[in-house]
UniProtKB/Swiss-Prot annotation:
Organism for this UniProt entry: Saccharomyces cerevisiae (strain ATCC 204508 / S288c) (Baker's yeast)
Spans traversing the lipid bilayer: 237-257, 265-285, 313-333, 344-364, 380-400, 408-428, 457-477, 488-508, 531-551, 565-585, 604-624, 633-653
Highest taxon, organism lineage: Eukaryota
Cell location: Membrane
Membrane association type: Multi-pass membrane protein
Protein family according to the UniProt entry: Belongs to the multi antimicrobial extrusion (MATE) (TC 2.A.66.1) family.
Other noteworthy facts: Present with 195 molecules/cell in log phase SD medium.
Protein name as it appears in the record: Uncharacterized transporter YDR338C
Amino acid sequence: MAGILSKTLSEVHPSLRTNGMGIGNTHRRISLGFLPPNKKNPLVRKFRARTRNIDQRSFRSLTDDFGSNVHEPNPYLGNIDEEPDLYYHDEEDGELSRTISLPSRVSETPELSPQDVDWILHEHERRYSSVCNSDNEEASQSNTPDRIQEYSGRELEYDEFMNRLQAQKQKLTRSAVTDAKGTSHHRRPSFVSVTSRGSVPTIYQEIDENDSEALAELAHSHVTFKSEARVLASYSFPLIFTFLLEQIFPMVCSLTVGHLGKNELAAVSLASMTSNITLAIFEGIATSLDTLCPQAYGSGRFYSVGVHLQRCIAFSLVIYIPFAVMWWYSEPLLSYIIPEKELINLTSRFLRVLILGAPAYIFFENLKRFLQAQGIFDAGIYVLTICAPLNVLVSYTLVWNKYIGVGFIGAAIAVVLNFWLMFFLLLFYALYIDGRKCWGGFSRKAFTHWNDLGHLAFSGIIMLEAEELSYELLTLFSAYYGVSYLAAQSAVSTMAALLYMIPFAIGISTSTRIANFIGAKRTDFAHISSQVGLSFSFIAGFINCCILVFGRNLIANIYSKDPEVIKLIAQVLPLVGIVQNFDSLNAVAGSCLRGQGMQSLGSIVNLMAYYLFGIPLALILSWFFDMKLYGLWIGIGSAMLLIGLVEAYYVLFPDWDKIMTYAEILKETEDDEVDSDEYLTDSDDPDENTALLGA
C-alpha cells in the first residue's frame, strides 16, 4: 500500500506538488494521514468552541467549505481553470484528495467583519510570501528542459490581490454600520479556492461599484509618458486657477484698507507678513499629507486617508495654541521692533481678530489635500469661485458701508469670514458631491503616531519657510536703499509669488501621482510621473519668464505711478524672469521629493542653499559690489538653481528600495494601531470568544 501511494505521488504534476494547499507545500506540509488537532490554530479552536467535539474534523475540500461562487466569472483576474482532482482508488474504493481542508461547518460561521479580513490578510501574507520551491524540489526540477516559469508577474498579481482584500475590509466596515441599524443584508460573499496552479485567488465576488472603479484605477495599466502628461495636465489646470484665486484675497484686503490711510495700509502689510509666516508653518505640516494620503489611497487603504487627515488636523491645532497666544500679545512683542505705537496697535488688533480664522485655514488646507489624494483637484475652483467675489463684497461692506461698516478692523473680520466660508463649502463638497469614500468616521488613531507625523511635518515646514523667509529678507534688505527700491522690490516679489503658483500646482499634482504609484508599489510608473513633472516645470518656467520679460512695462505701470519705481521694476523684471526658470524647477522637484516621502532631504538642501549660499551671496553682490536689487536677485536665483539641480537629481535617480521601505514602515505603523481586543490569543479555553478570522 505504501509503495503504491509513493509511486502515485511521484507521478503527480509538479505544479500540484508545489503550490497546493497540501502536497509539497513549502510553507505548510500537511500530512495525508489523520490530522492531529492544533489547539493554537484559530480555525480549529473556533470549531471546537462551537461543536465541543474534536472528532468531527473532515478532509473535505477547501473549495466546498469556503466558496459557493467558485465557478462564477471573475471580472478582475479572469476565470480560474480548475484541474480535475486526482484520486487514488484502492480496493475499498477509498480516495485521496489533492487538497485538505477544515470542517465543512466552518462555512456556517457568523458574518465576516473587518477583523476577519485582517486575519486573512496576515494568513495570505505568510502563505504567499514566496513562490519558490524547496531546495530539494528546485534541484530535482532544474534538470527538466521544458520547465515553464509559472510565476512571471506574480508579485504584481499578489499586490493587486492584497489591495482588493483591503478594499473589501472597508466595505465590510460600512456593512457593519448598516447592520447595527437593523438593516438586513445579503449573505456574505464567499472565497474562491486556491488552485493547484498557484494563481492568485479571486476574492469576494461581490464588490462595490465604487470600490471596483478605485481598484481598476489602482492597477495603473499602460502608463506611458504621453498618457501621464495628459493626466498631470488635467490635474494641474484646476490647481493653477485655485492657487491664483487664493492670491487674490490678500490683495483685496490691502486695496480695501489702503484708502483709509498710510498707517492702516502699513498695519495690514505688517499683519499680513506676520500671519503669512505663521500660516506657512501649518501649510508645511499639511504637506505631510502629500506623502501619507496618496500612498494610503494608492495601496487601497482608503479609510487610512481619513485617519491621516484627522491626525494632521489635531496635530496642527495643538501646535497653533502657542502661536495664537503670540498673536494675542503681539503688541508688546512688536514694540521691540517697531517704534510707532499707532502702527503697533493697529497691527495687534488685526492679528487678534485673525486668531478666529486660522483654525478654518488649517481645516481648509488639510481637507484640500484629503481630496487631492483621491484625484479630486477641481473642488477648490468651485469653492474659490464662490468665495472670491463674496470676499470683495464683504470686505468693502465691512470697511466702507456707512451702516454696518466698522472701518479698519472690518478687513480682518472679512478675512475670518472668508476662511470659514471656504472650509464649509469644501466640506459640503466632500460630504455631498465627491470625496466621502475615504472617510470612515472619527477615530482615536488621530491622537497616535504624532512622532512619525512630526518628522514629515518638520521637514515640510523647513522647505516652505526657508523660501518664504528668503523673500521677506530680500524685501527688508531692499529698504536699506530707500523707499523707491523697497516699493519696487515689493511689487516684483508679489508678481514672482503670483507666478510661482503655476509650477507649484504642477508640483502638487506630480507629488500626488508619485505617492499613489508608490502606494500601489509601481515605482516604474512613479518614475515616469517624475519625468513628466520635471518636463512640465521647464514649460512653466519658460511661460513665466516670457510674461515678466515681455510684459515688464505693463506690470510696472499696474503696480505704481511713480516714474522712478516704474523704471526700477521694468529693469529688474527680466532678471526675475530668468530666475523663474530656476524657481519652477525648484518647486516641482521639491514636490516630487514630498511625494516620495523624502522631505528631510529637501529641507536640508533648502536650508543650506538659501542661508549658507544664496543669502550671503545676495548681500555681497548688493552691498559690496553695489548691484542693489540686481545683486539680491542674482544671489537668491543662484540658490534656487542649486536647489533645483540637486533635488532634480534625487528625483530622477532615487533609491527606490529605501523609498519603498519607508512607505512600508508608514503602512505598518498605521496597521499596527488596533485595539487590544482584536488580537488573537493562544488560550485553549473552550469558552473563549475569539473571532474565527480575527486580526
